[in-house]
């Protein structure tokens, strides 16, 4: 929204001829630029309405929780995406700038000088935005991304993402279009809108033409409007002086964009949603389950170490899988350290590539679906498909099999589905007929792949007899039930023993683990076939896993009840104090 007089939303004129900037730097975009603009607008100032450029510290919202920000929240409904995907939206904008020469996007945390609060910074060296481009970026519902290679399409990604992370953001950008160099600053502040009681979304912006020897302000309405927008920015942004504001543009270089998001949201406990202290090389979402449970089962610890769990709370893990193809000359730099891209398809075991054509015609090339077992199988039961759209991860580890079903355990796939449309938040796909056909096809792929390869990892295909040619045994040992061994036994240590337990163990070249089931031959093998014994072993193994799961759930329940008990005790203590205070008041009366 242009800072014209009809849109500015204020009638304040700021005195730019202050002594706060005594530096003689007259470089492009330097402090001298403000002095030249101050002298340009001196004749437009009205003494009775003049305000000093150095304003009081910005005011904060009473409520700092995103979910309790108020029903008049300026961002459209549907902005419910978690913080990590909101950050990914801003990374997408930088990736789209690769075609304009961008080589990096930096994501970091800084401290605001005014109140020492944390803020998020995103900076890229792309082509930047001219004044018109910045207005379109910060207005609702506009998108100039019509290319088949760019990721965004709805036009609200920047606004919804920044507002999901914090109440306020300020954008600095420099660009050159048609031989004209410009630099612009725009402020999208929910705090400003609420505190000043604005009925409309007022977005103050200032633009400067840096093509000439001395930078000049670009005036759309009047010099007073330009000055009023600057005053709003100085009052409600993290920067109180013109010099501080201009230094941010200098940090960009000749072209690029910097976005600073501040007044970050808090959770219900009054703690920042984003954690910057758990890992100095990462930005993390708070995982409450880690802090609630004192005793965690070993299997759960192993699951939490896998990237399928890690990417839900770690921005570095999420960013490493965010794009399918590796960048040639572009880096995502998180807190000063480049993110190493990762594709789980590169480490699948027994991998297969299946071609899928979603269209009835054969004019378009079929989509390749890579599928295989994770390297931790069968130790971890992680499964699902990482589905990308235009190189961007939309659904990580999408489980197409039924919940609780063992079929497909450990099977992971990767595909780029450009033939279906993502939802507005890029966290799912639209439920179209093409999507439903893809889901049905993926279920079939998992089923066929599982039936072909599951025996390699000691799983048994339901309804199919066990392969007698691959049934082997180990030396004599005390009979046990449901013994699990993640490592294969060397072939030279395996032999058949009449008195020992019969097991089913498959160990092929690509497998590193197997399931061993042992039964007592004297008590349990009479009148039972090998297939029945195998099925019984599987049932015992599944029951064991159910008990482990129940144990974890019960531990979580105990932890929650203990927490509720502490809260109840605290409430009782407060009520007791109130009752005692009332009793004293009545006694005094």
UniProtKB/Swiss-Prot annotation:
Keyword match Cytoplasm: no
EC number per UniProt: 3.6.-.-
Location, primary (coarse class): nucleus
Localisation per UniProt entry: Nucleus
Keywords: ATP-binding, Chromatin regulator, Coiled coil, DNA damage, DNA repair, DNA-binding, Endonuclease, Hydrolase, Nuclease, Nucleotide-binding, Nucleus, RNA-binding, RNA-mediated gene silencing
Primary gene name: MORC3
One Pfam entry name: Morc6_S5
Organism: Arabidopsis thaliana
Protein name: Protein MICRORCHIDIA 3
Family statement drawn from the similarity comment of this UniProt entry: Belongs to the MORC ATPase protein family.
Domain of life: Eukaryota
Gene deletion effect: Likely lethal, leading to seeds abortion.
GO MF, any single term: RNA binding
UniProt-listed GO biological process terms: chromatin organization; DNA repair; positive regulation of defense response; regulation of DNA repair; regulation of gene silencing by regulatory ncRNA; regulatory ncRNA-mediated gene silencing
